[in-house]
């Protein structure tokens, strides 16, 4: 029984029954409805925000990608912010370069070498966050009335963006471990104008697309000249020896707009 994990030995106490939590099975691949009830979606999102404002503050909330303050080195972050402000040049109140600070863009470009991105600072544009980057990309890539393919379920902020830009959303069947079904994407290619994915550790499912799926999706979209906006915000939160590659690593035609922090 000890070998099977049912009991454990404790010094000077003997054997006790071991707690073995029940391992729940992973959810099945989602089967989203083909209907797009944007009004109902926006009302639901508004309700989520209201619950965040008036809800029990002692409850950890997983509806937004925001860690609790106790998990962050707040004092150290504040100290570094003060140090940075004190070392800013005299013209620090002026606008920076249009694409963003050159030193930051060089640092991001160097970061992409870890997955053979080989991007240069000229390829990088800094924004006020990934949501801002996705909004800019969508406004350039798609026009009012266009249809974008997304995972199901999808981060509700993406639904808000699509709604504000007058875009239609087509949800794809999504596996909680491997992400979207490439075959399902292939079937809807004639209906879509762009694709928006969180390829690594999707929010909210947590799925991570295998490299072969990423490569297949990128090649498929490139063949039909359909741009892919890739939100890679969570790519660095991994357990293992190496960071999972983004879809951008397999992009040979320049159809992937990659965003990260």
PLM ranges: what are they?
Residues 1-82, 260:
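N-terminal basic, amphipathic alpha-helical segments
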Residues 227:
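Metal-dependent active-site segment of extracytoplasmic phospho-/sulfohydrolases and closely related
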């Amino acid at each position: 029984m000890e070998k099977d994990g049912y009991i454990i030995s404790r010094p000077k106490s003997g054997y006790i029954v071991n707690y073995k939590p029940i391992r729940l099975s992973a959810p099945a691949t989602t089967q989203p409805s083909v209907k797009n009830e944007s009004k109902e979606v926006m009302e639901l999102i508004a309700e989520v925000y209201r619950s965040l404002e008036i809800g029990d503050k002692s409850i950890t909330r997983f509806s937004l990608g925001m860690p609790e303050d106790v998990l962050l080195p707040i004092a150290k972050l504040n100290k570094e912010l003060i140090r940075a402000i004190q070392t800013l040049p005299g013209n620090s109140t002026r606008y920076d370069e249009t694409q963003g600070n050159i030193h930051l863009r060089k640092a991001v470009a160097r970061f992409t070498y870890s997955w053979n991105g080989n991007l240069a600072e000229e390829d990088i544009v800094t924004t006020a966050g990934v949501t801002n980057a996705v909004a800019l990309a969508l406004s350039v890539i798609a026009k009012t009335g266009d249809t974008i393919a997304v995972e199901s379920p999808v981060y509700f902020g993406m639904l808000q963006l699509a709604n504000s830009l007058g875009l239609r959303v087509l949800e794809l069947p999504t596996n909680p471990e491997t992400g979207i079904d490439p075959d399902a994407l292939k079937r809807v290619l004639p209906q879509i104008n762009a694709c928006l994915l969180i390829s690594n550790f999707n929010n909210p499912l947590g799925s991570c697309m295998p490299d072969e799926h990423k490569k297949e999706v990128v090649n498929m979209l490139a063949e039909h000249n359909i741009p892919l906006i890739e939100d890679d915000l969570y790519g660095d939160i991994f357990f293992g020896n190496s960071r999972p590659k983004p879809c951008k690593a397999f992009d040979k035609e320049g159809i992937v707009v990659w965003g990260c922090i």
